[in-house]
């Protein structure tokens, strides 16, 4: 309707929300700034934004160094007694579970989780790896590393794997891009990690998973390589 009226008047439409008008942040603004995932996005956004506009208390716990607009929210720390006075708490985290003491405090609260997409995964694997094995191995790997699968932003491998069905299928399952790197690109950083003459002989570089995670994250590797019966994963984190 706003666009329709602006067309009649030959003017530029300005669409505002209640949080804009009240000079406050909003759940959707926070999620957008983090490229974040929220389950039941629309319903959660409408509910939380309505509370913010009506000056009701909504807690915000930031698990990490994420920089977001916190206006209108009650920013909490894990040792904060304010948690007890909150009915609803928005949590920003790329982890599956938080510290045990914090979980206890949040036990009876309604939790709205924003999962920033800041995790990248380097993958090496044997040719013709089964798709289910690849998917199940990654799910298990992320669970053991306490990483939320919704935090994955991108996966990558060496260019000889560009047609590897298991990795292509994984990117579709995760709904994230699959980026490939040439041996020349990988060789610029593979000296930083464990070397395998067998890998060098077969694909032209000394290793794949760690250098690819390094390249995807601009050098911010957070989990070294882990092997799963013909598959190797490594994790990097990008700065948002």
Whereabouts are the PLM-identified features?
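Solvent-exposed, flexible loop/coil residues
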Residues: 34, 38, 190-193
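Long lumenal/extracellular ectodomains of secretory and single-pass membrane proteins
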Residues: 41-45
């Amino acid at each position: 309707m706003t666009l329709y009226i602006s067309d009649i008047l030959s003017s530029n439409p300005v669409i505002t929300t209640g949080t804009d008008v009240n000079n406050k942040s909003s759940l959707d603004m926070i999620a957008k700034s983090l490229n974040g995932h929220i389950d039941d996005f629309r319903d959660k956004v409408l509910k939380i934004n309505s509370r913010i506009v009506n000056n009701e208390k909504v807690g915000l716990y930031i698990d990490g160094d994420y920089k977001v607009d916190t206006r209108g929210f009650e920013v909490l720390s894990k040792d904060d007694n304010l948690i007890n006075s909150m009915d609803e708490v928005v949590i920003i985290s790329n982890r599956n579970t938080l510290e045990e003491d914090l979980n206890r405090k949040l036990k009876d609260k309604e939790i709205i989780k924003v999962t920033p997409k800041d995790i990248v995964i380097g993958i090496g694997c044997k040719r013709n790896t089964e798709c289910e094995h690849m998917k199940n191995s990654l799910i298990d790997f992320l669970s053991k590393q306490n990483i939320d699968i919704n935090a994955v932003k991108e996966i990558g491998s060496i260019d000889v794997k560009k047609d590897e069905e298991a990795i292509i299928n994984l990117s579709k399952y995760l709904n994230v891009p699959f980026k490939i790197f040439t041996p020349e690109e990988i060789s610029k950083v593979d000296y930083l990690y464990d070397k395998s003459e067998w890998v060098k002989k077969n694909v032209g570089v000394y290793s794949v998973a760690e250098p690819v995670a390094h390249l995807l994250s601009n050098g911010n590797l957070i989990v070294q390589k882990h092997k799963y019966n013909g598959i190797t994963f490594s994790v990097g984190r990008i700065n948002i």
